[in-house]
UniProtKB/Swiss-Prot annotation:
Catalytic reaction equation(s): RNA(n) + a ribonucleoside 5'-triphosphate = RNA(n+1) + diphosphate
MF-aspect GO terms: DNA binding; DNA-directed RNA polymerase activity; ribonucleoside binding
Gene3D superfamilies assigned to the protein according to its UniProt record, in alphabetical order: 2.40.50.100, 2.40.50.150, 3.90.1100.10, DNA-directed RNA polymerase, beta subunit, external 1 domain, DNA-directed RNA polymerase, subunit 2, domain 6, RNA polymerase alpha subunit dimerisation domain, RNA polymerase Rpb2, domain 2
Name the UniProt record assigns to this protein: DNA-directed RNA polymerase subunit beta
SUPFAM superfamilies: beta and beta-prime subunits of DNA dependent RNA-polymerase (SSF64484)
EC numbers on record: 2.7.7.6
Record gene name: rpoB
Pfam family, one: RNA_pol_Rpb2_45
GO biological process: one example: DNA-templated transcription
InterPro entries xrefs: DNA-dir_RNA_pol_bsu_ext_1_sf, DNA-dir_RNA_pol_bsu_external_1, DNA-dir_RNA_pol_su2, DNA-dir_RNAP_su2_dom, DNA-dir_RNAP_su2_hyb_sf, RNA_pol_bsu_bac, RNA_pol_bsu_CS, RNA_pol_bsu_protrusion
Signal peptide limits: none
């Protein structure tokens, strides 16, 4: 196999038994692909999807009078003004200007108004500004008002039809009531439901129910038509005392004979006997066409069609009449010889529609429509036109109802219609088919649907959500435009005058700014960002709510297999409602989640891979990945455990149709990062996958010794690492930039031969963690496309590295690891193993107030010189200054006055200057418990407001930096172009004299060295083709020079122009303070198996337990934390980690020994380590230098990969421990650091990858003496952010009462709470040196009195 540049440096020993034939897809594809298809990026001709489809669905808009029409032509997204970094800095949205080309068509008023015959009088075409559309960044996020946000995909109920029952919970009788629902993508929901009397009702949009026949009648069916649609008929020929029944033998099956059934004078079925299949077969054989039955047989049967009087034509008996004695008499009197009755068989088909029809009070189509109108619009007057318009708009018009492509496909599939396409509105046939299927289900001939299966839930991704917002905005615009079009010709209007962009841009802005699904990006580490973008939420608009979601919808469903992770979900009230995509899952064109499988044919696994949705999966028999397969792909076992129709079954290998693609297919990215996941309890695995997202990036990331093999994929797909676009050679590298000279073979003449990668240095993430990139390459390194060039936060050599590998011992230690507490060695802190950098952004605004503008200045009243020492003359802190709690970062004064100044007073003050006492100090200060170093200051000034000296110097610095970057880039590119020119000219004959070189002389590299680039560009050779290529390259250099010059001018203009600031803000100063935080008591740490704990003590190195060789333990964990938690994976990780470290020590010894045959010795040892188990590595292809470099990188341990559900076996761990010269038990004799005595028994020792979580004690620790109080109750505020106090609640009061601490209790309930007067007296007595507590009236009593007074009851207090 081919290794990448970084993989060669450090190979992870993979123990997976079966390699997947499919590589992991781009983990951010669900976001990026959806948005790209919405804006149709990189497509020359626009398809009918996304934004283009929205415009096409709303336009053309035609005037009411039909003489004007506005049509959509095309749209264009312009380049954003600022790049992503500038948007974050300035606090603006990274967006593109959307311009839409519309044409206004005016028709001749004298011509026909018919669409096809209208004469066009005039066409006015114009580009319309339709607002700003936020663009997705390369990492799948949006920058909204300077902050990175992620739009979470939504899992909602799929449009289509669904059949269900209430499980007998609705009615007290416990009777199961069936129902069905047609769910459109947009429009009214249509519900059909049975009541406990078995009548069928319809609800529109969950309104009051109506008999289903009312809807059918409104659709144009008569009573007779309704019965004909839903029932079969039986023909009866009437005689004087009996009647002949038309015989259909199959209909008699399972009924009880009401009379003797006789054929050829033989009694086939006696009266009172149940008719069986055998009887039916006999009757068919005999071939009876009719049977004579007594007239009493007709009683209680239902007439299927109207019976008319032959003479008058009047209806004698209407359809759906139950035959009683009187009806038989009427038939006899009128000499009716033939009637048709409904075939109703109690055991097969119920009379539901017939019974419901009798309840229906409507008789005609218009009456039925009126009835629906009164339910939908109660209280509104119902005219015939309004009634018809409402009914037609409900389900049958595109502008009000849309089933969508998905809905039509689901509806057709469920109803058994062959085609998956059709109209996006309902038809009469659709509604009738749904009712028929519901009756079938009620009769037991079909089954209800599973509501929670992923076949009935689809993903609505970002593109679709913005599409819906655009449609909402354009529909608002449409109403206004339609009215305006009537005046289009007379007022000489243009499209620009008619279209108002505000409703559209407001809808989009509202979605990105305040939608429940547009979330502040989780950016603690690369994994948290990837997981956030792959999150699937059932909450949000059009989804579920926490309160109403039951257990079933939250539970893991068999259809989640390979699509949604069964492990990763939040622990709180959102459990099961927020899920994460499985590693290989993707959405199909309908929005349903699909997972890949390998096709199995005749018991043989093929190389063909198919993506299958939950809808199609039901028909397949799917084997698991661990099924035994031979070298030729043949399934070896006779009986194989498979999944079929959501159940596990044992089947013959020939019946298997698909097989899983990979063992980690079931899990999400975070869950598949947990080694030995298969040995952990699911609850702890859930905590483990959630806590990995909270790991803070440490100063020096360290790869996990025990991983799962997916670490590299996560690191590269998260885009925190820098990856090469093309293969080439590293030309130059420093801390902030990497320059690659692209392979000349892969560079076309028109392309640049240089790639320049600028690295991110000490940038702030959303959670204030540090984003910093470090180069991995050296000058001269040969790299390939997609190789990792630079590490980002929490990555080590292109692999995800969330924590540190710590030497662990599972043992009790003086109670310091009681209840999951963690004991750590002082050495861990001294080595800065868990030191993290946190960057905080603090912002000061200078506003224009009613009393005059606020001023940023160093001249602040009543502030000492010492407090101003770190500020420059403008009043802004210096970069590099060390600041602590309470220090001023930006000096600012705000005008204060009792009265609002008149314009005249303002003018006088402006002329004669202001007095110092008219301003108050409103400076930006460092928070009480914070400290750090100022690493950057940015000043933004509004247009037409004069910039101060500091702002000008910052701008000049930024401009200088841009100029240097441009000069460097151009120098590199120009140098590369002329290097290629020299190569092209070399060896050719000169055609014209150039300086000292004569015509006809052969050009060599030595000759050309004497010439500068200017001279080189003038050389002409005899070969015309070479001259042409050289001219093209020189032209390219000049074009690049012009491009850079233009770019510099644009950047200069951007810097010099005023910033877009919030209303009323004149100036904005951003100060970035970096804090270095070491590990300390109270910080939270965790492993990857849900084994979390809080540091209880930092012990001196000499007190820690130590091994025989004197090496000390880094972390001591409680062994009692393992058995009850059932996360044994952590113990296995410790054993394998110990073996990995031991192998590293052996390699170190070999390198340090420096034997003559060292390379061979190391090569043989590495071959034994890598190729004795699991995946085989091709070490023979490595050169000696590469082997030595690989060995050098393995000094700290050989990294292992044990994929989830396909991990290393116990015997292999023991073999590795033996190979590393360590005890096979994984246990060692430890000695007490304080006494030197050995512990009683051997202890499990090894290496575990431990994380420092973003729950730091410094951010939580808080103390208050006095501080702010609530305005109404006058009680202290709560929370650290408000510098609040600690709540002393009801139960705490009981505790003090129990101890009889009366004085303390009085103090708590009065002066320390809301006794304002008492507080003042207390302060005075402390100042006077006395110790008196005098309580006056608590403010909460005054509040209570006020509330009683608001009820109209006066309360007066009497003095006693």
């Amino acid at each position: 196999m081919a290794y990448s540049f970084t993989e060669k440096k450090r190979i992870r020993n993979n123990f997976g038994s079966r390699e997947s034939i499919l590589t992991e897809p781009d983990l951010l594809a669900i976001q990026i692909d959806s948005f790209n298809s919405f804006i149709q990026k990189d497509s020359k001709t626009k398809q009918d999807i996304g934004l283009h489809a929205v415009f096409q669905s709303v336009f053309p808009i035609t005037a009411v009078n039909g003489y004007a029409q506005i049509e959509y032509v095309d749209y264009e997204l312009q380049e954003p003004k600022f790049n992503v970094e500038e948007c974050k800095l300035r606090g603006v949205t990274f967006a593109s200007t959307l311009r839409v080309k519309l044409s206004l068509v005016l028709f001749d008023k004298n011509g026909s108004t018919l669409k096809k015959k209208r004469k066009i009088k005039q066409i006015i075409e114009e580009d319309i500004y339709l607002g700003q559309l936020p663009l997705m960044t390369e990492t799948g996020t949006f920058v909204i008002n300077g902050t990175e946000r992620v739009v979470v995909s939504q899992l909602h109920r799929s449009p289509g039809v669904i059949f269900e029952h209430d499980k007998g919970k609705t009615h007290s009788s416990g009777k199961i009531l069936f129902s069905s629902r047609i769910i459109p993508y947009r429009g009214s929901w249509l519900d059909f439901e049975y009541d406990h009397h078995e009548h069928l009702y319809v609800r529109i949009d969950r309104r009051r129910k109506l008999p289903v026949t009312t809807l059918l009648r409104a659709m144009g069916l008569s009573s007779e038509g309704i019965l004909e649609t839903f029932f079969e008929k039986t023909t009866i020929k009437l005689k004087a005392k009996s009647c002949d029944l038309n015989m259909v033998p199959i209909r008699l099956q399972r009924t009880i004979a009401e009379f003797d059934i006789v054929a050829n004078q033989d009694v086939i079925v006696e009266k009172g006997r149940r008719i069986t299949a055998k009887h039916v077969k006999l009757l068919k054989k005999v071939g009876i066409k009719s049977i004579n039955v007594p007239l009493e047989y007709l009683l209680d049967k239902v007439i299927s069609a109207d019976i008319f009087d032959k003479d008058t034509g009047e209806i004698l008996i209407s359809a759906n009449t139950i035959i009683l004695e009187e009806v038989l008499e009427l038939l006899n009197i009128n000499k009716i010889k033939k009637i048709e009755i409904l075939y109703i068989n109690a055991s097969e088909t119920g009379a539901y529609i017939s019974d419901t029809l009798r309840l229906d009070e409507t008789q005609t189509e218009i009456e039925a429509r009126m009835s629906i109108y009164h339910v939908m619009r109660p209280g509104e007057p119902a005219t015939e036109d309004a009634v018809n318009l409402l009914f037609n708009n409900l389900f049958f018009k595109n502008d009000r109802y849309d089933l969508s492509k998905v809905g039509r496909m689901k509806l057709n599939r469920r109803l058994g219609i062959g085609s998956e396409t059709g109209e996006h509105v309902l038809t009469n046939d659709d509604i009738i088919s749904v009712i028929k299927l519901l009756i079938n289900i009620k009769d037991g001939n079909d089954s209800v649907d599973d509501v929670d299966t992923l076949a009935n839930r689809r993903v609505r991704a970002i593109g679709e959500m913005i599409e819906n917002q655009f449609r909402v905005g354009l529909v608002r615009v449409e109403k206004v435009v339609r009215e305006g079009l009537n005046l289009a010709e007379t007022d000489e209007l243009t499209p620009q005058d008619l279209i108002n962009s505000k409703p559209v841009s407001a809808a989009v802005r509202e979605f990105f700014g305040s939608s429940q699904l547009s979330q502040f990006m989780d950016q603690v580490n690369p994994l948290s960002g990837v997981t956030h973008k792959r999150r699937i939420s059932a909450l949000g608009p059009g989804g579920l709510t926490r309160e109403r979601a039951g257990f079933e919808v939250r539970d893991v469903h068999p259809s989640h297999y390979g699509r949604l992770c069964p492990i990763e979900t939040p622990e709180g009230p959102n459990i099961g409602l927020i899920n994460t995509l499985a590693v290989y899952a993707k959405t199909n064109s309908y929005g349903f989640l699909e997972t890949p499988y390998q096709v199995v044919k005749n018991g043989k696994v093929t190389k063909e891979v198919v993506y299958v949705s939950a809808i199609d999966e039901i028909t397949h028999t799917i084997a698991q990945v661990n099924a035994i397969v031979n070298d030729k792909g043949k399934l070896m076992s006779d009986l194989i455990s498979c999944r079929h129709k959501n159940e596990f079954v044992l089947v013959n290998s020939s019946k298997v149709t698909l097989i899983d693609i990979d063992s980690k297919q079931i899990a999400s990215v975070a869950a598949s990062l947990i080694p030995f996941l298969e040995h952990d309890d699911a609850n702890r695995a859930l905590m483990g996958s959630n806590m990995q997202r909270q790991a803070v990036p440490v100063l020096k990331a360290e790869k996990p010794l025990v991983g799962t093999g997916i670490e590299r994929v996560v690191a590269t797909d998260s885009r925190v690492c820098v990856t090469a676009k093309h293969s080439g050679v590293v030309e130059a590298v420093d801390a902030s930039r990497i320059v690659i000279r692209v392979d000349s073979k892969k560079t076309k003449a028109s392309e640049l031969g240089v790639d320049i990668y600028n690295l991110t240095k000490y940038s702030r993430s959303n959670q204030n963690t540090c984003i910093n990139q470090k180069p991995l390459v050296k000058t001269g390194d040969k790299i390939s496309a997609a190789d990792v060039l630079a590490d980002g936060p929490s990555t080590d050599m292109g692999e995800l590295a969330l924590g540190q590998n710590m030497k662990i011992a599972f043992m009790p230690w003086n109670g310091y690891n009681f209840e999951d507490s963690i004991l750590i060695s002082e050495k861990v802190i001294q080595e800065d193993r868990y030191t993290t950098i946190h960057i905080e952004e603090l912002t000061a605004y200078s506003r224009d107030t009613k009393l005059g503008p606020e001023e940023i200045t160093a001249d602040i009243p009543n502030v000492s010189e010492l407090a101003l020492a770190k500020l420059d003359e403008v009043g802004v802190v210096y970069v590099g200054a060390r600041v602590k709690g309470g220090d001023i970062l930006v000096g600012k004064v705000t005008p204060k006055s009792e009265t609002v100044l008149s314009p005249e007073e303002k003018l006088l003050r402006a002329i004669f200057g202001e007095k110092a006492n008219n301003v108050k100090d409103s400076s930006l200060r460092v928070g009480a418990s914070k400290s750090g170093v100022v690493i950057d200051v940015q000043i933004f000034t509004r247009d037409r407001v004069e910039k101060d000296d500091r702002a000008l110097s910052i701008d000049a610095e930024r401009l200088e930096r841009i100029k240097k970057d441009i000069d460097d880039e151009f120098g590199i590119i120009d140098g590369d172009i002329f290097r290629r020119v020299r190569l092209k000219l070399s060896g050719n004959m000169l055609s014209k004299v150039a300086g000292d070189i004569k015509a006809g002389e052969k050009l060599s590299a030595k000759l050309m060295k004497k010439l500068d680039n200017k001279d080189i560009s003038k050389l002409k050779v005899e070969d015309a083709a070479v001259n042409k290529e050289v001219a093209a390259l020189i032209k390219q250099a000049k074009a690049k020079q012009i491009e850079f010059k233009k770019f510099f001018e644009e950047e200069k203009a951007k810097i010099n122009e005023g910033a877009e600031l919030p209303p009323g803000v004149m100036k904005m100063v951003k100060v970035y303070v970096a804090t270095s935080k070491t590990l300390q008591v109270g910080d939270k740490m965790a492993g990857r198996h849900g084994n979390k704990g809080v540091i209880s003590r930092v012990s001196p190195v000499e007190d820690m337990p130590y091994l025989v060789d004197g090496s000390t333990i880094d972390v001591v964990l409680n062994p009692l934390g393992v058995p009850s938690r059932m996360n044994v994976g952590q113990v296995l990780e410790v054993h394998l980690g110990y073996a990995a470290k031991g192998l590293g020590y052996k390699i170190t010894a070999m390198l340090d020994e420096k034997r003559t045959d060292m390379v061979k010795q190391i090569r043989d040892f590495l071959d034994e380590v890598y190729n004795s188990y699991g995946k085989q590595e091709n070490l023979a292809s490595f050169s000696d230098e590469e082997i030595i470099e690989l060995a050098s990188n393995l000094r700290e341990g050989v990294p292992m990969a044990t994929p989830v559900f396909d991990g290393i076996k116990e015997k292999d761990i023991k073999s590795l421990l033996k190979l590393a010269d360590l005890p096979e038990s994984g246990q060692e004799q430890l000695y007490d650091g304080r006494t030197g005595e050995p512990f009683d028994r051997h202890v499990t020792v090894g290496y575990m990858h431990m994380l420092k979580l973003n729950h730091l004690v410094n951010d939580k620790m808080h103390a208050r003496s006095t501080g702010p109080y609530s305005l109404v109750t006058q009680q202290p505020l709560s929370g650290k952010a408000q510098f609040g106090g600690q709540r002393f609640g009801e139960m705490e009061v009981w505790a003090l009462e129990a101890y009889g601490a009366a004085h303390t209790l009085r103090e708590m309930l009065t002066v320390k709470s809301d006794d304002v007067g008492g507080r003042a007296k207390m302060y005075k007595s402390i100042v006077d040196g006395k110790n008196l507590t005098e309580s006056i009236m608590p403010e909460s009593f005054n509040v209570l009195v006020k509330e009683i007074r608001s009820l109209g009851i006066d309360v007066e207090l009497e003095q006693h």
